[in-house]
A protein has these predicted regions:
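ATPase catalytic-site recognition across NTP-hydrolyzing enzymes
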Residues: 1-32
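Acidic two-metal-ion nuclease catalytic site recognized across multiple nuclease folds
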Residues: 3-4, 15, 170-186
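Generic detector of well-ordered alpha-helical packing
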Residues: 29-32, 91-92, 163
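An active-site-proximal beta-strand-loop segment
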Residues: 30-43
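Short, charged, surface-exposed loops that flank catalytic or proteolytic processing sites
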Residues: 137-138, 159-163
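C-terminal interaction surface of TIR/SEFIR-family domains
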Residues: 154-159, 169
Length: 186
């Protein structure tokens, strides 16, 4: 049952070994938590893009970070992926502080008001993964992908849900913004 974990099945995730051409709508999704660094949740930033109906997780940063480390991580990911036109940041608690500081120096920071609870938000994005439309890096490209898959598989009963939150935020954005610009540029 979803309450016992297993909302996202391990076999749902498709793998990419070379970044596909023709990707569009590059975004970042951020879950910002900074408290006591030894026991706090993780700060997670993900880079996503899409091609047709498919969504691609391209990169991720994850760690227990202070406020200044979180700002530096977002600056770094934005510099590494300048094609990310939107940076989605949950406008709650720590995310609000990040938004206030970085929107003065990084373009495209979009405050996101979360809907429902974590389980509701995650469940709203299961169909695209179950349908085989979510691609994640192969393990030899991104060593962190194992932890991503395991956290997703354990949700909502796992110890952490920060990567789930980022995934849900990015894919809820794509679900709500289905316009495919690639049809105009091909």
């Amino acid at each position: 049952t979803p309450s016992a974990g297993g909302m996202f099945k391990r076999e749902w995730w498709k793998r990419w070994t070379a970044m596909p051409s023709g990707l569009t709508d590059f975004i970042q999704s951020w879950d910002c938590t900074f408290k006591d660094k030894d026991t706090s949740d993780f700060v997670v930033g993900q880079v996503w893009a899409r091609k047709g109906p498919n969504r691609y997780l391209l990169d991720q940063v994850r760690g227990r970070m202070s406020f200044t480390e979180t700002l530096d991580a977002m600056r770094g990911l934005s510099a590494k992926w300048p094609q990310t036109t939107r940076k989605l940041v949950e406008d709650k608690a720590n995310g609000t502080a990040v938004i206030e500081v970085l929107r003065k120096e990084i373009s495209g920071i979009i405050p996101v008001e979360p809907f429902g609870g974590k389980i509701v938000r995650a469940h709203a994005t299961t169909a695209v993964a179950e349908a085989g439309n979510v691609y994640i890096p192969a393990a030899n490209i991104a060593p962190w992908v194992h932890d991503f898959v395991e956290e997703m598989a354990a949700f909502p009963s796992g110890a952490h849900d920060d990567q789930v939150d980022c995934y849900s935020q990015a894919n809820a954005y794509y679900n709500d913004n289905t316009f495919d610009i690639s049809a105009l540029i091909s």
